[in-house]
Amino acid sequence: DGDVDEMDFRYHGPIPFSKETAVLMMADSVEAASRSLADKTEESINKLIDNIIDAQTKDNQFVNTNLTFRDITVIKKVFKKKLQNIYHVRIAYPV
């Protein structure tokens, strides 16, 4: 049987109730998913962050918070910059 039930992999706890808990949820999801990226380019990191946070927004995960669309845009921008800094390729220096 190749069918996968999405509900088996969803968190069944309460949705975030404050801006802070929403940001923690976003950060945890983005950080965990970024570890599985084979190609950690700026484009792939940006796409990953947009997809995850957009899906959480569409899934009404932030309805109990006071987050605005502007807040979410700023959060995405910060996450993108931070992850790009973490995963940027360093030049090999002679030893």
Task: Please identify what each model-predicted range represents.
Residues 1-95:
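Terminal helices and disordered tails flanking the catalytic cores of nucleotide-processing hydrolases
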